[in-house]
Every structure is written in structure tokens, then in C-alpha cells.
Amino acid sequence: MYEIEFTTIHSYGSEREGISVPVVLKAGENSVRLAASIDTGATFCIFRNELAEALGLDSANATLKRFRTANSSFEAFGHEIEISVLGVTTVSIVYSFADASINKNVLGRVGWLDRVRLGLVDHDATMYLAPYDTE
């Protein structure tokens, strides 16, 4: 039998679509609180455009990236910021949608999932989380 240790347990509620968690994004002295969906199929972390504005991030100083999905494509601006989820904090490049009409916040593999240990028991709507480097 295998054992994995976690530092946090979170009940995410089975009545909602997807697995949503509380997130704090921070850039310099600015921070915003939001809910984001964990998406193991998403390569990157991508957030609503208005959150980048609230953090004081300037698209002129960002890395522009074009994303392609099965049925669409979109552009997003990348910035290095701090992400905190349930007490687990990391610094990562995350993206904000260039199109302000896209209303999604997603925690993806690169920059978040690759930095944590994540366990799910969906039957119980329970998530287990720890920083990856926890011994």
C-alpha cells in the first residue's frame, strides 16, 4: 500500500460544476481573491482579464501567447505572480485572457498542478492538497 501526505483538506461541494477552490493572486502589493476551477486538462493557469487589471498588471509588459483548443483559439497575456490556494503558495507565470468577455479562472498543470500534491475523492467531494516538496 502507498501513502501520500497532505497538509490541507478541502470540501469543494458536489452541487457545483467542476472542482472550485479559493485562490489569492498577488502581484507586488496588490492582491485579489477569487474562485478557480482545477483543470487537469489545461496546460496553463488562465484567469479573467479584469483580475490582471485589479493586480495592476500591464499587458504591454506581458508575454502574449496564442492558445488553441479543440473548437476555438484565444490570446492571453502572461505575467509572473504569486498564487495561493488553501495555504499553498507558489510563484508562477499565469495568463489573463485578452478578451474581457471570457469569464473563466482555471488552475492548470504548468505553474500550479506541477507544484502541488493533489488527491481527490470525488464521491465525498473532498480534495487533499500539499506543496510538492513537503516531506
Feature-to-residue mapping (PLM):
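Pepsin/retropepsin-fold aspartyl endopeptidases
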Residues: 1-135
